[in-house]
Every structure is written in structure tokens, then in C-alpha cells.
């Protein structure tokens, strides 16, 4: 099913944006965002991840024009949102859909009527409203729930109504504010699959904010990591997962991959080498290397035993990525040679310490 598409250019461009909130009652001013530059290409899915207080909510409020930046420009669908007066901004928002963490449905309206609300506000005739709402109910899998009230729907069904409502005005851009945070893991997966299908079917540009790296891994083409009002890392989802550079990014990535050392190993890990200790290495395999027998080749080449302590291989953005934590004999020359051979094969290697 395909909804009518706007001919306006799609995508989001955030240029040198800062947002500072003034001091209140003796407290210092708050710098929520500082020199933010971010491009969301047409038809892409971009995730912005950050901890609480990183500036995510401020960013999304600037994109939909709910707040003005202290400096910089926000361009959505070819229109500079930050330069519009209120009537023009209301019109521009029709091309921007929004879904929320807590659904924001009207309890006195049925699923059909909640989806119809933005069309009613826009003055669309009732006959035309039905032509839009019924296909949307079908798209989100709620054709049989059109007359149900929010209290009669599950959390996942409420979010599906919210998604359909966001699509009612045929937007070119969809903003998602922690849309899966209130859902259980199974329902989260279903909503993410729905968003991916909508992105593909409608060529919809999606920007979502989240604090969950698993959501980024499942949904995003690209990711930007926000920390204390700054974008500290940005890139394709695969590259950010495979080779995180910033410490905040590394913590996010380790929470959903096998790159984090298990607690039992951390409890035994030592910084200094003892006489009977082995060196502990963390090895990341990218792309086709994730399926290659590199460790067995190295074990034969150097005549050593390699003990696998932890790890996994998974798919990220359609590409295999593997992480293994291993121990090998701790002679410095040997550790260096093994590390160099792994790096020459395209793997990333980190020496974590020593273990008895």
C-alpha cells in the first residue's frame, strides 16, 4: 500500500545548532546542545543515541519547531524550520510525523478517530478522511481494531495507532521520541519491523532518538552518539559497532554485543603479568573475516593454545560482526606477533590484561 507522496525534497539538515536555556532562580544557564551538525539523507533511518540529559529531547524539539535554537539552522524537507512564522510552521509540520514514548492517544477516541485527528484539524472532509485512515489501519495491522478505544488496546497496539496517526498527513519525515521504551522486547521488535517496512514502502525519512543501542542495531542505517550536548561520534551503524572510538560509544556498544568482558573475567583480570598468567585479548572480526578460521590458523602458526573466554558472532546492518575474548601465552614478543597477524588480517585487537 502506498500513500500519496509529497513532491517536496525530503531529509533533515542540522547546521551549527546550539541550544542554551537561560538561568533560573539563581541556577546557571544550561547548554543543552552545542555546535550540532547532522545530516539525515532522504529515505534513510538515522538514530541519535544518548544517555539521560545528553540533549536528545532538545534536539527533536528543534527539528519539529517546538523550540528555537540559540544559534544555527534546522532544515526539514528543504524548508528552514527555524525561520518560519507560526502559520508557516504549522503548515511545515504537516510534512513531519511524530511518534511518542507514551503514545499520546486521546482516551475518548477510537483507534480510527485518533488517526483521523490531524486530518480533522487540517480541515479534510470526512469522506476523504476515511480514504486515508482505513488503509493506514491496514498498514499497521489494526484493521480489526478500528472501533477500539485506547483502554482496550495493548501497548504495542497503541503505538501502532500512534504510528498510523503520524502518517495521516502523508509526511516525508518521521520523528520518533523513544517510541519503544515503554514496550516489552517482543513488542519492540515488532514495532521496529513495522518502521523498517514503512521506511521501505513509503520511502520515508526516519530520525529516532533512543537510549537503547539494541534499537539502533535493529533499525538504523546511521547513528550519532550524543553526550552532554555534543555529537561525539557519528557513522554508519556497522562502522560504529565494529570500531567505536569514543568511550561513551564503547559502553553503548558493549551493552549489546559480546565485546564486554563478563563479570567473572573482570573479577580475575589483572593489569600486571604474573609468572603463570596468560594475556587476555579482545578481537573484533569484521565482514567476511567473522567467518574465517583465523584463530585456528594462528594457533597452528605459533604452536600455541588459544582459550576462548567469551564471544559471539551476529549480524549488524546486514553484515557479520564477531567479537571474541581469548587468552594466550603472555610472553610479550608472542603477544605482539599474534596481535600484528590479527591486525594484518583486518581484525581489531585490544590487550585487556592478564589472567591466571
From Swiss-Prot:
Keywords for this protein: Amino-acid transport, ATP-binding, Cell inner membrane, Cell membrane, Membrane, Nucleotide-binding, Translocase, Transport
UniProt: ATP binding residues: 50-57
Record Gene3D superfamilies: 3.30.70.260, P-loop containing nucleotide triphosphate hydrolases
GO CC annotations, alphabetized: plasma membrane
Alphabetical list of InterPro entries matching this protein: AAA+_ATPase, ABC_transporter-like_ATP-bd, ABC_transporter-like_CS, ACT-like_dom_sf, MetN_ABC, MetN_ABC_transporter-like, NIL_domain, P-loop_NTPase
Location relative to the cell: Cell inner membrane
UniProt GO molecular function: ABC-type D-methionine transporter activity; ATP binding; ATP hydrolysis activity
Disulfide bonds: none
Family named by the database record: Belongs to the ABC transporter superfamily. Methionine importer (TC 3.A.1.24) family.
Record's subunit section: The complex is composed of two ATP-binding proteins (MetN), two transmembrane proteins (MetI) and a solute-binding protein (MetQ).
PANTHER family linked to this entry: AMINO ACID IMPORT ATP-BINDING PROTEIN, METHIONINE IMPORT ATP-BINDING PROTEIN METN
Protein name stated in the entry: Methionine import ATP-binding protein MetN
Native source organism of the sequence: Rhodopseudomonas palustris (strain BisB18)
Source taxonomy: Bacteria, Pseudomonadati, Pseudomonadota, Alphaproteobacteria, Hyphomicrobiales
Amino acid at each position: 500500500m502506498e500513500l500519496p507522496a509529497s513532491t517536496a525534497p525530503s531529509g533533515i539538515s542540522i547546521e551549527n545548532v546550539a541550544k542554551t536555556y537561560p538561568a533560573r532562580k539563581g541556577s546557571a544557564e544550561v547548554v543543552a546542545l552545542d555546535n550540532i551538525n547532522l545530516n539525515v539523507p532522504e529515505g534513510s533511518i538515522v538514530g541519535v543515541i544518548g544517555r539521560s540529559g545528553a540533549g536528545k529531547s532538545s534536539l527533536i524539539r528543534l527539528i519539529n519547531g517546538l523550540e528555537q535554537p540559540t544559534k544555527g539552522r534546522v532544515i526539514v524537507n528543504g524548508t528552514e524550520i527555524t525561520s518560519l512564522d507560526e502559520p508557516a510552521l504549522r503548515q511545515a509540520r504537516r510534512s513531519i510525523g511524530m511518534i511518542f514514548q507514551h503514545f499520546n492517544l486521546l482516551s475518548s477516541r477510537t483507534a480510527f478517530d485518533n488517526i483521523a485527528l490531524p486530518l480533522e484539524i487540517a480541515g479534510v472532509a470526512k469522506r476523504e478522511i476515511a480514504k486515508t485512515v482505513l488503509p493506514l489501519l491496514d498498514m499497521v495491522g489494526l484493521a480489526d481494531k478500528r472501533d477500539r478505544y485506547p483502554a482496550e488496546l495493548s501497548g504495542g497496539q497503541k503505538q501502532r495507532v500512534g504510528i498510523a496517526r503520524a502518517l495521516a498527513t502523508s509526511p516525508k519525515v518521521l520523528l520518533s521520541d523513544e517510541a519503544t521504551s515503554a514496550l516489552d522486547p517482543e513488542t519492540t521488535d515488532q514495532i521496529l519491523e513495522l518502521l523498517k517496512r514503512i521506511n521501505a514502502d513509503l520511502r520515508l525519512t526516519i530520525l529516532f532518538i533512543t537510549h537503547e543501542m539494541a534499537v539502533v542495531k535493529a533499525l538504523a542505517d546511521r547513528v550519532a552518539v550524543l553526550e552532554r550536548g555534543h555529537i561525539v561520534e557519528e557513522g554508519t551503524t556497522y562502522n560504529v559497532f565494529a570500531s567505536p572510538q569514543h568511550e561513551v560509544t564503547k559502553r553503548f556498544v558493549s551493552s549489546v554485543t559480546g565485546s564486554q568482558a563478563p563479570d567473572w573475567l573482570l573479577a580475575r583480570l589483572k593489569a600486571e603479568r604474573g609468572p603463570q598468567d596468560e594475556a587476555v585479548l579482545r578481537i573484533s572480526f569484521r565482514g567476511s573475516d567473522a567467518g574465517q578460521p583465523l584463530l585456528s590458523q594462528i594457533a597452528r602458526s605459533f604452536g600455541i593454545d588459544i582459550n576462548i573466554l567469551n564471544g559471539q558472532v551476529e549480524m549488524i546492518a546486514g553484515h557479520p560482526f564477531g567479537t571474541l575474548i581469548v587468552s594466550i601465552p603472555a610472553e610479550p614478543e608472542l603477544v605482539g606477533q599474534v596481535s600484528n597477524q590479527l591486525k594484518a588480517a583486518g581484525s581489531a585487537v585490544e590487550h585487556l590484561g592478564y589472567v591466571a
